[in-house]
């Protein structure tokens, strides 16, 4: 009988030890892992070209005041999107760069104002940018109310014809146009779809 009691105590002690282990495991905190991502289309390389040469500036050279007033001074150039990976389309938006503004009263116009700091600075002169090789045809890329210009990418590249046209500032009169340096900086925002 003593052997049975001793065996019972050993089994009971082991059961308590085992229950104690399970209790410890039951109080261990668990961690959840949540992975969140947004799978997006690839992007493209972008560059501006004028006459098949890569440029960073669209240089009008010398322009005469009557050309500005008449709006007859324009330059064509291209935005090239290349090496596009899984990108069927994009939207271009043109916005004034830091330190640049829109033309018109209080900067409310749709052309890009002269932001030159040179002396003398051309007064009452602005530049329009158009989504075609010919100004005043196609879609104007507006300054104040920046609009999205859709581009379809076929294959891995696309050439987007654009043009810039010097004009009289929409908030000024012809007599306000003066000679001097002109510079207007803008930034293309490209959203891939």
Predicted segments with their positions:
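Bacterial N-terminal signal peptides
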Residues: 9-18
């Amino acid at each position: 009988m003593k052997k049975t009691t001793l065996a019972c105590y050993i089994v009971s002690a082991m059961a308590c030890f085992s229950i104690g282990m399970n209790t410890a495991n039951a109080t261990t905190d668990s961690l959840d892992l949540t992975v969140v991502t947004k799978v997006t289309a690839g992007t493209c390389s972008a560059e501006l070209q004028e006459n098949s040469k890569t440029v960073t500036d669209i240089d009008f050279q010398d322009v005469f005041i009557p050309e500005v007033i008449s709006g007859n001074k324009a330059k064509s150039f291209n935005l090239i999107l290349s090496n596009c990976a899984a990108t069927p389309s994009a939207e271009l938006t043109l916005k004034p760069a830091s330190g640049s503004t829109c033309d018109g009263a209080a900067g409310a116009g749709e052309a890009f104002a002269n932001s030159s700091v040179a002396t003398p600075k051309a007064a009452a002169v602005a530049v329009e940018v158009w989504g075609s090789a010919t100004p005043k045809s196609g879609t104007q890329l507006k300054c104040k109310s920046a609009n999205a210009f859709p581009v379809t990418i076929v294959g891995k590249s696309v050439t987007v014809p654009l043009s810039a046209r010097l004009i009289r500032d929409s908030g000024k009169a012809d007599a306000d146009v003066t000679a001097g340096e002109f510079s207007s900086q803008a930034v293309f925002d490209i959203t891939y779809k």
